[in-house]
Structure formats: structure tokens, C-alpha cells
Amino acid sequence: MTVNRLGLVVHGGRSEAVAAARTVREWCAEHAVRCTDIDVWHDHGRRNSQEEVEAAGDPDLVVTLGGDGTFLRGARLAAADDALVLGIDLGRVGFLTEVPAAAVRSALDAVREDRLSIDSRMLLTLRASRRLEVPEELEAWAKYGRGPLLPPPQVRPDCEVDADWGIPLNVTALNDVVLEKLARDRQVSVGVYVSGRLLASYSADALLVATPTGSTAYSFAAGGPVVSPRAEALVFTPVAPHMTFNRSVVTAPDEPIALRVLECSGSAAVSIDGQLRGVLDPGDWIGVYAAPRRLRAVRLGPMDFYGRLRERMNLTDAPAAVADGSPAPLWSVTTPPPGDLAHLTLLTAPIAQ
């Protein structure tokens, strides 16, 4: 792949990220690639997605140096510009980053020499009953202990605004969209609709809609299912609902999920990939849909999602079932699958650590 412009998204609060950034800049200088930095820790400019693309130099490739939070910032930038994104792993429990920091130079060489595969990930987008805004009194609270607060999403100029379908927002989510309570002493009351039909009215601390990628993030912590990132689905999960039905609901990508704040409720915050982006009042609603655009993430080898799930979540075996030694794979990793299984995705080579 020809790389002319590289956008470098760095968590400047981590010394190892700063050191890896120097390696990336050196590589760019050696190969005459223009490199533009965005420091998600120290850069306090509030930019919408298009302004961030311009600030990053309209990159062909976005490289993130940090954990999953930094990757989400880079993914937002890459999705807005249809660029590739490569995540360098400097986090502790993340699932999104691909390459260890020590291998950053060889990873960039692999991208340049086209020794890569593209992992296409589903994204979410929104429509809303009105424009989203963050009240000024909430901004200091939202920024506490974090980097800069992202601005409310703009209205997409290329989409039709309709009284029935609401205002199209120029925003995407790789992990999740969350509607959560603002008041400490009361839950938020929300009507949840699937494909326009009422599923149930909830009283809960929060309600979230996740992608398969986001199923191992907030949704997982709230008791939601683990979904393969290769699947196409929307995962709805209530957080601490005060009702008998507390299960997640998994819908098809063409079955949108809408959340309407009920008149008996207080206001609710809208967070997109962990960032507060607006507040809804009683009567307001958001609709969450599968986005027409996709995230294109760089993969340098086969993705062992379930091996990473076992490792990162520190999964343990039942004492009565555990065997001595390391567990062997069920299928051989040295031969290809037989013809009747050729349509399946099976790892046929050891995963490099």
C-alpha cells in the first residue's frame, strides 16, 4: 500500500506512547511520508470529525499509540476519511489494538509492502429528534480526569431531514451509543423501540446499543453477550434495570433501535464511544442504526479473537474440568480443513505472539 500521509494519534500522557511516536516519525522521515500528530491527552481543541481529518493532514493511514480509548479516537478520524487505521497496543485489557509497541517499525514496513489484510468493522450512526447539545454546566464534569471534550455532532448535510425520521447526525460509533441518567438519585425512564415497535419501557441507570466490536466493552461489563466482531448485529443492553426483564436483545443490522426519554423521566446524557456528546430532555429520542460506512482496520495476521478473549478477560477453567498443561487446539493447526469445512473460518497457522 502506498502511504503518502500518516496521521499519528498519540496518548501523550504515556511515556511508552511518546517513545513509539518517535519511532513512527523516524520511519516516516526515512520513507518521505508526511506525518501529522494529534495528541489526545494535551490537545484541547474541540473539533468535529471533518476538522479533525484536516488537522491530521488528510491521512491515508492512521496509526494510534495508546489503549482502546486512543484507538477509538483514531477510528473516528479514519472512518470520517475512509482511511486505514493501525492500532499499536499500549493498553492493558483492550481488544482493538493490533501490534505490540516493539513491532511498530516492522508493522509499518508490512503496510508499505502490502503484507496486510483489511478487517472491515461495523459502525453505528444516529438520528435524533433535535440537535444534540451539551449544557455548559456539564462540560467541567464531563472533562474531569479526561482529555478534551468532543463537540456535539453536526447535522449531516447530505441526508434528508424529516419530521418522522429526525435529524441525521454526522457521527459514527465503533463501540457503543449510551443513554444514561444524569441525576444520582433517580434512574432514567426510556421507551425502547426495535424497528419502530415498542419493545418495553425501562427504568435503568443506562441503556446502551453496541456493535459486535463493542460487545466486549461497556455492554460486556453490564452483562451483555460476547459477539464475534465479524458478525453483523446491534446489541441492546440495559444497565441495572428496575424490572424483571433485564436481558440483552440482539437485532439484525437492518432492525434499528430507538430510545425515547419518557415524560416521567429526568434528562439523560448521550455518550458515543465513551464521550459525552449531548443531553436529551423528556420527549426527546435518538435512533441508532448500522452506518453505511465501515471502519477499515489493518490486520497483519489471522485474528485470534477467542484466544484474546481468554487472555484479556483472564478466563479460567472449571476446577473439575481443567486438564494438565496447555490446552491443545481442537483442530489441527498444520493442515487445511477438509472440503466440507472449507467455508468455515478456522485458524490454520500458529498465532504470532
Show where each model-derived region lies.
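Short aromatic-centered micro-motifs
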Residues: 192, 214, 270
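N-terminal glycine-/serine-/threonine-rich phosphate-binding loop
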Residues: 1-81, 114
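Catalytic, metal-anchored helix/loop core of enzyme active sites in primary metabolism
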Residues: 16-19, 26-30, 201, 212, ...
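ATP/nucleoside-binding phosphotransfer catalytic cores, i.e., glycine-rich phosphate-binding loops
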Residues: 179, 195-198, 244-353
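Gly/Ser/Thr-rich active-site loops/lids in small-molecule metabolic enzymes
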Residues: 187, 197-245
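Short glycine-rich anion-binding loops that position phosphate/pyrophosphate groups of nucleotides
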Residues: 68-70, 93, 213-215
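Catalytic core of DAGKc-family lipid kinases
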Residues: 95-205
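Short, acidic/small-residue loops that bind anionic groups at enzyme active sites
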Residues: 82-98
